[in-house]
C-alpha cells in the first residue's frame, strides 16, 4: 500500500495545540458583513476547536503534521 500523504489544504487550515487538539478558524468571515450583527462578527474572530465527531477524519488528513 502506498504511503499516506498529508492533505495540504487541511494542513494550511488547521493547527495542532500543545495538548493535541486541533484548532481551526471559523467559517462565514470573508464577506457580507453588513448582514451580520456586531456580536456575531466578534464571535467569529475567535478560533475554535475541531469537533470531537470530526477529529478522527481530520487527524487522518494530517497524518504527519506536528
Curated annotation (Swiss-Prot):
Keyword Ribosomal protein: yes
Region span, Disordered: 1-49
GO annotation terms (biological process): translation
Start-end of Basic residues biased regions: 1-26
Pfam families membership: Ribosomal_L35p
Signal peptide positions on this chain: none
Alphabetical keyword list: Ribonucleoprotein, Ribosomal protein
GO molecular function annotations of the record: structural constituent of ribosome
Protein name as annotated: Large ribosomal subunit protein bL35
Species per Swiss-Prot/TrEMBL record: Staphylococcus saprophyticus subsp. saprophyticus (strain ATCC 15305 / DSM 20229 / NCIMB 8711 / NCTC 7292 / S-41)
Lineage: Bacteria, Bacillati, Bacillota, Bacilli, Bacillales
